[in-house]
């Protein structure tokens, strides 16, 4: 299966890129600059492409992102600290982000005669992000079948959509994913902050998977208190 992977440079998408490279035919990685404050993640995506020996397509959609106002990832709004399940994390939603990225990626895949576009959405994303849920993935795949009917046959591959981030870590170990060469923190500082939703989820995932976390955090222990009040929640 000739596959293009949407890769942000984060733990999930880099792990997916390594998985695809091992199990299928990885054609390229595609990343998006949408004006995110944690733009340094894109350097990790570029490094992943170089490591796997495939092209890296960096697509600038900053002019679109500038109009998707109200998100802590793109606006002058503080990135909240805490667990992903907290209501404050809704401020990190960039409306329709995955739908926009996937639409572009499908066009690229059709032009390059790929069989699939792969995305690393997972079960831990469901509570906050509607465009990471199984219902969205299935509906988008059906929509694209109509959009490209008679021109190209490209499918959406989302192998992590119903599993936890800890399961991704466990799976990624099999493919030698270099966890230290991934970036998750939404704040985009010199080091992972250890306090934002993605840092908390990242640290918790390594703990639950029983895998050593090589990440340096500004606050390495915040995740313990942040996760105590929450159990994994699924939204379909």
Curated annotation (Swiss-Prot):
Chain's role: Catalyzes the ATP-dependent conversion of 7-carboxy-7-deazaguanine (CDG) to 7-cyano-7-deazaguanine (preQ(0)).
Reaction(s) catalyzed by this protein? 7-carboxy-7-deazaguanine + NH4(+) + ATP = 7-cyano-7-deazaguanine + ADP + phosphate + H2O + H(+)
What is this protein identified as?
7-cyano-7-deazaguanine synthase
How is its cofactor bound, per UniProt? Answer: Binds 1 zinc ion per subunit.
Record-listed Zn(2+) binding positions? 185, 193, 196, 199
Point out the signal peptide segment. none
Q: Which family does it belong to?
A: Belongs to the QueC family.
Task: State any single GO MF term.
Answer: ATP binding
The alphabetized UniProt keywords are: ATP-binding, Ligase, Metal-binding, Nucleotide-binding, Queuosine biosynthesis, Zinc
Which pathway does the UniProt entry assign to this protein? Answer: Purine metabolism; 7-cyano-7-deazaguanine biosynthesis
Instruction: State the superkingdom.
Output: Bacteria
Q: Where does ATP bind?
A: 7-17
Q: Return the InterPro entries for the record.
A: QueC, Rossmann-like_a/b/a_fold
Annotated EC: 6.3.4.20
Q: Which cofactor does it need?
A: Zn(2+)
Q: Which GO terms describe its biological process?
A: queuosine biosynthetic process
For whether the record's keyword set contains Transferase, the answer is no
């Amino acid at each position: 299966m000739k596959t293009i992977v949407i890769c942000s440079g984060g733990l999930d998408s880099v792990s997916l890129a390594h998985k695809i490279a091992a199990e299928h035919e990885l054609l390229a990685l595609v990343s998006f600059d949408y004006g995110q404050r944690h733009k340094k993640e894109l350097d990790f995506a570029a490094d992943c492409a170089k490591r796997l020996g495939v092209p890296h397509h960096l697509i600038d959609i900053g002019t679109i992102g500038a109009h998707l106002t109200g998100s802590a990832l793109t606006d002058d709004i503080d990135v909240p600290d805490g667990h992903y399940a907290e209501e404050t994390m809704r401020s990190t939603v960039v409306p329709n982000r995955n739908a926009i990225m996937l639409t572009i990626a499908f066009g690229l895949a059709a032009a390059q005669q790929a069989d699939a576009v792969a995305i690393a959405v997972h079960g831990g994303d469901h509570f906050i992000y509607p465009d990471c849920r199984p219902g969205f993935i299935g509906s988008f795949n059906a929509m694209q079948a109509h959009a490209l009917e008679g021109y190209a046959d490209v499918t959406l591959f989302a192998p992590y959509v119903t599993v936890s981030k800890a399961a991704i870590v466990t799976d990624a170990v099999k493919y030698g994913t270099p966890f230290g060469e991934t970036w998750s923190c939404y704040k985009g500082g010199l080091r992972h902050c250890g306090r934002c939703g993605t840092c908390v989820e990242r640290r918790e995932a390594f703990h639950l998977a029983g895998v050593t976390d090589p990440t340096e955090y500004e606050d390495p222990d915040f995740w313990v208190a942040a996760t105590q009040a929450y159990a994994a929640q699924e939204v379909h």
